[in-house]
């Protein structure tokens, strides 16, 4: 199982990957320089990836301003918590603001709403 990262860092990593994917797709268009239509398609897809990355960065920036900032009990640095449970950005200490989850084993499923029957 992969180690869990903080949600903000996960989304930022996705946005960074979109930028690199966009550049790689645009460079892929160079291989088709004899066909202007294919070059146009590859360049457009690359630019759309970069625009998508910009949108994701703007969205996580807005989300980050609304996140609750807490001091990590382990490393004593300030970190942001999204949802009921999250990890410290610096030391990967599990954090929660829900008193009913204190002392329980960290599980990402605590952030999902359960359906009551």
From Swiss-Prot:
Keywords: Cell membrane, Membrane, Transmembrane, Transmembrane helix
GO CC aspect terms: plasma membrane
Entry's transmembrane regions: 13-33, 37-57
Top-level taxon in the UniProt lineage: Bacteria
Subcellular localization: Cell membrane
Main location: membrane
Membrane topology, record value: Multi-pass membrane protein
Cross-referenced Pfam families: DUF2614
Family statement: Belongs to the UPF0295 family.
Name used for this protein in its record: UPF0295 protein Bsph_0336
């Amino acid at each position: 199982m992969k180690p869990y990262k903080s949600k903000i860092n996960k989304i930022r990593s996705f946005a960074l990957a979109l930028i690199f994917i966009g550049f790689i797709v645009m460079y892929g268009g160079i291989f088709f320089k004899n066909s202007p239509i294919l070059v146009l398609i590859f360049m457009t897809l690359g630019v759309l990836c970069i625009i998508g990355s910009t949108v994701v960065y703007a969205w996580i920036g807005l989300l980050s301003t609304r996140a609750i900032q807490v001091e990590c009990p382990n490393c004593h640095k300030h970190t942001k918590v999204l949802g009921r449970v999250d990890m410290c950005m610096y030391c990967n200490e599990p954090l929660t603001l829900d008193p009913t989850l204190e002392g329980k084993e960290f599980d990402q499923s605590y952030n999902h709403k359960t359906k009551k029957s």
